[in-house]
Amino acid sequence: WKGDDPALIMNDTSWLLEDYQRGGSVKTFVKHIEEGLKIAVEDKSSLLVFSGGQTRRQSWKTEAESYYHLALTMSKGLPFFSDSQEDPSQSRLPFEPLDKSETARASRYMSTNEHFDLGRLRMTTEDYALDSFQNFLFSIARFYEFTGTYPQKITVVSYEFKKRRFVDLHAHALRWPSNKLIPGGTQRLNYVGIDDEPNSPSIPKLHDSAYDLFEVDMYGCYGRLLEKRRKRNSGRRVPPYSSTAPELAGLVDWCPAINSRLRGLYPGWLPWDPRASTGLGRGAQVILEQNGGKFVKAEYLPDGKRIV
């Protein structure tokens, strides 16, 4: 979104669009934002992350910043921290707030309510992702930057036609435990898919052309996927997450051999592995499963020799 008059949000001319997105995609983008806001407002423990880098040469803003800005201009409810919740921004302010006059002037310019306390919002931006895999991975890293912990569950709001790509490929590449449940019975990965309306001119062109590419190149390291990232990174931004989310450094930089498919799955430890919650590694988990959930007890003589 260009950030023009909020009254013209639904006009294609207010957006930087690809040709195939004209005539219907704008309404879908707005629905995605509305759905994200709705989920975040209902789940008081959630953080809404708008993800997307500076992919357009005609704009100085990132995709995520434009969505965040648009969310502020909408009349929908916004996800605020409750009074009983700690606001992370209060403990690590990077700079002093602007004085009142500057804040008011900036607020009017941005078409937002000058009384908003943005530091109390449970939503943020992830400004480096250049494709859907990075949307997934970098949003987790940004969640850690903002909260100091990793998410227990993730809800992705995107196009329905991209669902298989996220659920079958990206989650697998991240080894995210999609089918596991958190206390309360909620799955750790949920997907809300919203496509353009059936009569939209863009519908015939909405198909997942990237699925086959990610199926072969799960981390987007080669060929057309790498070329697309380079083309989209006109701002020449470098994501900081190897430093700011250090447990993910290996995964962020991981590139297996070309055409390795599943054989190239990232082998290192990840914060959502069983070890993180149980204290047990994969080998110990296997032993437990083989022995009915119990470790075999070895018996020792007084001199320390084991009875075999």
Which residue stretches match the model-derived regions?
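C-terminal accessory extensions appended to soluble enzyme cores
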Residues: 194, 198-308
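A structural signal for short, hydrophobic/glycine-enriched beta-strand patches
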Residues: 1-220, 288-294, 299-302, 307-308
